[in-house]
Amino acid sequence: MKKKKIVIALGHEALGTTLPEQKEATKRTAKAVADFIREDYQVVITHSNGPQIGMIHTAMNEFCKLYPEYTATPMSVCSAMSQGYIGYDLQNAIRAELLNKGIYKPVSTILTQVVVDPYDEAFYKPSKVIGRVLTEEEAEAEEKKGNHVVKTEGGYRRIVAAPKPMDIVEIDAIKALSDADQIVVACGGGGIPVLMQDNNLKGASAVIEKDLAAGKLAELLDADMLVILTSVDNVCLNYGQPDEKPLSTMTVAEAKKCMEQGQFGEGDMLPKIEAAINFIGDSAIRSVLITKLNKDGSNIHGGMGTMITK
């Protein structure tokens, strides 16, 4: 009997912020992932890198201040670095948790490049905030380098483009490992954004929305289910208002209607809903669960969360 294929998208809550936090958080996350594996799902994992890529970007910028002759580190390289060290902790935590349960399955992290459109309007309207708060002097220095900054509370922040994912370069490798019943960590942080130039791939100065990348990954893998872990238990209507209403189920048509009404926050729930709609499409089989990871890492699919179907 063919196993059901599931893609699990981990939010930054499932990873922590600092290195010690990440070590502990990945242990809890591994328990939830192991539950799916024990129930005989074919599992592929993707994850956020919000705090981590910001720390890497800041660290590399500070390094360049000490050594001006050093070439500034591109965003695409920062993305690759974040995939490496988050994947390292994740795959080891999952491997250990599986062995504790008497299950042996190889766990691998694939450095993943995601193709974006050079004409994506996001390149003309950068919106994704990265890195620490900058002083006015530092902000001016960034602008002289050709980077975009925006004034925020307490100072300035650098902003970069967040283009939509078009294709995944390493999808065949991910499929091969997954079909061999191995656990795969891929498309970390939305993937390394790249532009196609003939036979070459060139890193783009951008970050990809990780929920949309998770949806694209699930689509290309022809997965049965996409699980998006976030900071809230359910998708809610009128979120944060006195008449807030959590939803246990939602259809694609209902999701589209709620989007038109402006129910979902941009950069928050909206990309998750967009990912769900894109992944499910016209399929009567595919489904998306949006929910929160329990603090103890216990089973995340016991009737909690919001299930989205056609």
Predicted features and spans:
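C-terminal catalytic "cap/lid" subdomain
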Residues: 2-310
